[in-house]
Amino acid sequence: MLRSSLLPFSYLYEKIINFRNTLYDKGFLKIKKLPVPVISVGNLSVGGSGKTSFVMYLADLLKDKRVCILSRGYKRKSKGTLIVSEYGNLKVSWEEAGDEPYLMAKLLPHVSVVASEDRYKGGLLALEKLSPEVFILDDGFQHRKLHRDLNILLLKKKDLKDRLLPAGNLREPLKEIRRADALVLTYQEVEPFEFFTGKPTFKMFREFCCLLNSDFEEVPFDILKEREVIAFSGLGDNGQFRKVLKNLGIKVKEFMSFPDHYDYSDFTPEEGEIYLTTPKDLIKLQGYENVFALNFKVKLEREEKLKKLIYRIFY
């Protein structure tokens, strides 16, 4: 009811967004181009949609290239342009990098990660210092000032019936799907859905394979056998994590929900308990022997078709 009362502000927000997009469409706002291919991965809504997972999946698909991920580094405790990692060599802490860029840098030793509010400037620094062959623009759908050679848009089921901010969670109207070159329908393992536009469309599934301990070493699921866990997450959509735990049959005696990008500075695990969270949250809680993250691999239907779509930009 409270968010419905914000509908007049959503109408105003829509006018502002439409005006901004028109300025880009008509060429009144300049779009800058980097000299190597750029693949943008983004979404239409605030909150979790699987962007970070898909970016890491994409980086693995491009293993034969020198990949650099360009990220804003949301809520990081630094400003400007920052090299987070150089092909596996971590340069900064998670606080300086932001949790998502740091997680990608930690789990992807074959790529480089750069954080910058201005992704074009980040790209220029990367070209000077890292010699990448391709950029992946993380959360790039609304960052229209940078040219992209392939524009991939992630959608989750909730997006299709949501409202614009602040009455809902959409950052742009659904009609802006027109700008996407390809669509990825996420969270199919918990909320399967179909969506047809005539654009290349792929379904994304998460396949849960193991646990990670606080050193990010793989641990078998067996440690949870006959145990109840305290689960928690600080994501854009904590409800998705709860659904995953339920679908996997994990016994949860308590679930704690924190805001997205929560820093856990006031969090102390109790001895004798087992805690289960996500990799993004775990990077802020290293050193605890009883805190684990649920790890998964991303699977895409028609992966070969996606590969062909991606590799066309290099020729």
Curated annotation (Swiss-Prot):
Pfam family, one: LpxK
UniProt: ATP binding residues: 45-52
Protein keywords: ATP-binding, Kinase, Lipid A biosynthesis, Lipid biosynthesis, Lipid metabolism, Nucleotide-binding, Transferase
An MF annotation (GO) of this entry: ATP binding
Catalytic activity reported: a lipid A disaccharide + ATP = a lipid IVA + ADP + H(+)
UniProt-listed SUPFAM superfamilies: P-loop containing nucleoside triphosphate hydrolases
GO cellular component, one term: plasma membrane
InterPro entries, alphabetized: LpxK, P-loop_NTPase
EC number, as in UniProt: 2.7.1.130
Pathway of action: Glycolipid biosynthesis; lipid IV(A) biosynthesis; lipid IV(A) from (3R)-3-hydroxytetradecanoyl-[acyl-carrier-protein] and UDP-N-acetyl-alpha-D-glucosamine: step 6/6
Biological process annotations from GO: lipid A biosynthetic process; lipopolysaccharide core region biosynthetic process
NCBIfam families reported for this sequence: lpxK
HAMAP family: LpxK
Primary role: Transfers the gamma-phosphate of ATP to the 4'-position of a tetraacyldisaccharide 1-phosphate intermediate (termed DS-1-P) to form tetraacyldisaccharide 1,4'-bis-phosphate (lipid IVA).
Entries under PANTHER family matching the protein: TETRAACYLDISACCHARIDE 4'-KINASE, TETRAACYLDISACCHARIDE 4'-KINASE, MITOCHONDRIAL-RELATED
Family to which this protein belongs: Belongs to the LpxK family.
The protein's name: Tetraacyldisaccharide 4'-kinase
Organism annotation: Aquifex aeolicus (strain VF5)
